[in-house]
Amino acid sequence: MMPFSVLQVKRLQLELITPAKPTLQEAKFLSDIDDQEGLRFQVPVIMCYKDNPSLNKNCNPVKVIREALSRALVYYYPLAGRLKEGPNRKLMVDCNGEGILFVEASADVTLEQLGDKILPPCPLLEEFLFNFPGSDGIIGCPLLLVQVTCLTCGGFILALRVNHTMCDAPGLLLFLTAIAEMARGAHAPSILPVWERELLFSRDPPRITCAHHEYEDVIDHSDGLYASSNQSNMVQRSFYFGAKEMRVLRKQIPPHLISTCSTFDLITACLWKCRTLALNINPKEAVRVSCIVNARGKHNNVRLPLGYYGNAFAFPAAISKAEPLCKNPLGYALELVKKAKATMNEEYLRSVADLLVLRGRPQYSSTGSYLIVSDNTRAGFGDVNFGWGQPVFAGPAKALDLISFYVQHKNNTEDGILVPMCLPSSAMERFQQELERITQEPKEDICNNLRSTRIMSMM
């Protein structure tokens, strides 16, 4: 494994990539889902590719991606603009064509030497996605930063940071797919982008018709452990859920839930319970977990165009007092998670938009008693092919304070799910202990299974 002190990343001068052709100069309003306070942050994504001379012999990934970016921005030209804030904090994009930030870099390391260090939480993220001073604001700053780092093995790492108000994971995937298609020679994206953010404006008059526990103001009762403002107190680790862990968890679920619960539901219930125990929250206080639910598709009955790349999700919250969550079997948490997810439909999303307008675009709750989880295992980042084949890893680079992203991961030959978590250092050790306990195989099963029962964590 390459020691951190040895790794050297050399960056060339930062540049602005503008659309390859002139684009409309106009102002475009974001939706009332887009511009909520809780989405006014940057999301880092990392994508790692092996050298593949049989597919792209003698091609320079920096040159190919730079040119494809410029061509894709002709279609996604709002991403080359800058955000402005209007009356009542309403966000709009000044489509001025100023461009996105791009930097070419090289590192004296191979992909093999990096090993698990490319997985979330990526400890080398600051090297592969340098935070240029003044570039990470929300208003008046570039909406996208892309760094392409060439490795000595011929592979490369594409890391990016996107302003979340502009798009969610499916929306970002549409943009990345367009870049990839053009990198492979296409003249236009196979799915043309659609702005139409007015489709998710609030109703007239706005009216809150659903319960939204995710936006409730609450006092932090996590025993003083959780202070998100003190980032030096926070640590990140990732935890792996493979076949063994899922088998043990499923054995704890009542029969009437087994056939209807997903892997995502079960992991979420497990994390919620273990995290609450680790934070030592007052037993009488309410704790919540939110599952990000995509509004696209027929299931939730929200009719959006195929190329819509704005934020189209809500995160309904399951809520419980800490004591029953910690003391009851896992099925208790699982039922609450499933019920919360089931509340998501078009009416729920419309009610969210109305709430955000009526209450001044509030932040979701930001106390330690709240957890937000997002399933990125089927997001499609692993299918983005710039001409070098599929990435060996692609997805969110780390957890973001209260938010954890589930990503696919192959541990040796087994497919599983990797979950990065962010917790105070004192709570992280307790969290790992609780997770190991709840995924521990019974003694009678261990005799039949020689695999380690210790859940794998990655620093």
Curated annotation (Swiss-Prot):
A Pfam family assignment: Transferase
Active site per the UniProt annotation: 164 (proton acceptor), 385 (proton acceptor)
Signals that turn on the gene: Slightly induced by ethylene.
A GO biological-process term: alcohol metabolic process
Keyword set, alphabetical order: Transferase
Tissues/organs with expression: Highly expressed in the cortex and skin of ripe fruit.
Endpoints of the signal sequence: none
EC number(s) given by UniProt: 2.3.1.-
GO MF terms, alphabetically ordered: acyltransferase activity
PANTHER family the UniProt entry points to: ACYL TRANSFERASE 4 (PTHR31147), OS05G0315700 PROTEIN (PTHR31147:SF66)
Task of the protein: Involved in the biosynthesis of volatile esters which confer ripe apple fruit flavor. Alcohol acyl transferase that can use a wide range of alcohols as substrate to produce esters.
Family statement drawn from the similarity comment of this UniProt entry: Belongs to the plant acyltransferase family.
Name of protein: Alcohol acyl transferase 2
Gene name, Swiss-Prot/TrEMBL: AAT2
